[in-house]
């Protein structure tokens, strides 16, 4: 600490810096805690939606296999190609969670009627239509899951960054400034004592001369 200037002005500046650092530390801790709460809430949502996606896909593949068994694989493929959906629209927006920008995905025109898919109830297994409905539902859920999982990743990164900043302030920056404050206070006390003894010595010499 040899490069520190032990003056009262420096001590005042340091006290102000410590107060600001402590305030920043408190705000960052609040942000960290709020982010963690939000993170776990979204994590719970992801778990539920992931289960829904798996269930929808499982049902869809079962119905597809049954449709292939009834109609034949080639017929199912021909109908699938003919009923291709070119009207799906994906909109991307964003929202802010505690300073973190996360995506908002919106998918439109996914679910269709049998007529929209280009086939009728005759000559087509009901299982194929059920499979189509379930795949459409799964696609909407997959988009919702993608939005949530991306948000989880971004929040986790921000939590790690915020934790590092909290720890840096708590264990490095604030303690270091507190040590500097203590050092300057001690040096000022020493300097005051030295000045006091110096003045006392000067006064004693003056008194001695006057008596002589």
Swiss-Prot record:
Residue ranges of the TM segments: none
A GO cellular component annotation in the UniProt record: plasma membrane
UniProt superkingdom: Archaea
Pfam annotation, one family: ATP-synt_D
Mode of membrane association: Peripheral membrane protein
Places the protein is found: Cell membrane
Assigned keywords, A-Z: ATP synthesis, Cell membrane, Hydrogen ion transport, Ion transport, Membrane, Transport
Single GO term (MF): ATP binding
Main location: membrane
Entry's Gene Ontology BP terms: proton motive force-driven plasma membrane ATP synthesis
Role: Component of the A-type ATP synthase that produces ATP from ADP in the presence of a proton gradient across the membrane.
Alphabetized NCBIfam families for the sequence: PRK00373.1-4, V_ATPase_subD
PANTHER family xref list: V-TYPE ATP SYNTHASE SUBUNIT D
Self-association and partners: Has multiple subunits with at least A(3), B(3), C, D, E, F, H, I and proteolipid K(x).
Family classification: Belongs to the V-ATPase D subunit family.
Protein name (Swiss-Prot/TrEMBL): A-type ATP synthase subunit D
Species per Swiss-Prot/TrEMBL record: Methanococcus aeolicus (strain ATCC BAA-1280 / DSM 17508 / OCM 812 / Nankai-3)
Source taxonomy: Archaea, Methanobacteriati, Methanobacteriota, Methanomada group, Methanococci
């Amino acid at each position: 600490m040899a490069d520190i200037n032990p003056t009262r002005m420096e001590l005042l500046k340091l006290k102000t810096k410590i107060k600001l650092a402590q305030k920043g530390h408190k705000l960052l801790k609040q942000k960290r805690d709020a982010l963690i709460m939000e993170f776990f809430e979204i994590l719970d949502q992801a778990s539920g939606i992931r289960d829904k996606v798996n269930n929808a896909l499982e049902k869809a593949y079962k119905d597809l296999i049954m449709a292939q068994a009834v109609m034949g694989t080639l017929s199912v493929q021909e109908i699938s190609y003919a009923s291709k959906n070119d009207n799906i629209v994906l909109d991307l927006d964003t929202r802010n969670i505690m300073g973190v920008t996360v995506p908002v995905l919106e998918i439109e025109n996914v679910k269709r009627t049998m007529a929209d898919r280009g086939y009728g109830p005759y000559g087509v297994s009901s299982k194929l239509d059920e499979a189509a409905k379930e795949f459409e539902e799964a696609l909407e859920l997959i988009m919702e899951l993608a939005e949530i999982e991306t948000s989880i990743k971004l929040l986790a990164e921000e939590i790690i960054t915020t934790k590092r900043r909290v720890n840096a302030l708590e264990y490095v920056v604030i303690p270091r400034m507190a040590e500097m404050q203590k050092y300057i206070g001690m040096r000022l006390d020493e300097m005051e004592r030295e000045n006091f003894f110096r003045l006392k010595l000067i006064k004693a010499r003056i008194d001695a001369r006057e008596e002589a």
